Amino acid sequence: MTNTRMLAAVAVASVLAAPAFAEDLTIVFKTTGGGGGGTVTHYFSSDKVRTGDADNETVMDYAAGKIVSIDHKKKEYSEITFAEMEAGLKAAAAKVDEASAQMQQQMATMPPAMREKMEQMMGGAASAVTVTKGGTRQVAGYTCQDYTLAMGQAMTMKMCATTALQYPMDYRKFQALAGSAAAMANNPMFKGMGKMVEEMKKIEGLTIADSTSMKMMGRSSESSREAVEIKKGPIPAAAFDVTALTPGYKKVPHPITKLK
């Protein structure tokens, strides 16, 4: 499983394990990673979400059923509906099925040790996922519980979650979309997704700090984020105004719509 697939799997699992809805939230994170440090702001309302930094942003409008991706550097943006997203995920799953079948045929002729290593790369590590509870600490004025999520030896994610905060949207309305992504768990390349979802249910509350360490194909990467400001209360509609966020920007096709 590639780094992107791993992170996507964690994202899906996070949505499926999301807490109940509450009032609007604005969270500012300090981040570190391969591209250097920075600041990312997340806006959560009952029907919209906006996340991103000075370079890239994403606006999700659950009421309208669409997602807008904004590239401030290129001055471009793209839109995709939930229906198109679901179709794209299904198309991606079909391609993964095809690639997996070909890989399985090739693996059948490999020595056992090499075959085992390939299976781990194709997602077997997800079935070895574990969540361990740690101590508590303070982040941005909130007490949070430390957890360590380990996916074999390929990825370790340390998270600190607080039960004092909740997402304002009701994710149960959008489980069909999450289900489309999770459906790829039926493919051998994503086996163990169910195990991941179950393990992540042990993480109680909203994550306000995390760090990720990944090792893949002889390479390693480190990234982290920690909330430095958390505000509760109504968010102005202007914060989600795509027109205002993309002045003079060019609209381009969303990459997922090209998956056929």
Residue ranges and their predicted role:
Residues A8-A17:
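Bacterial N-terminal signal peptides
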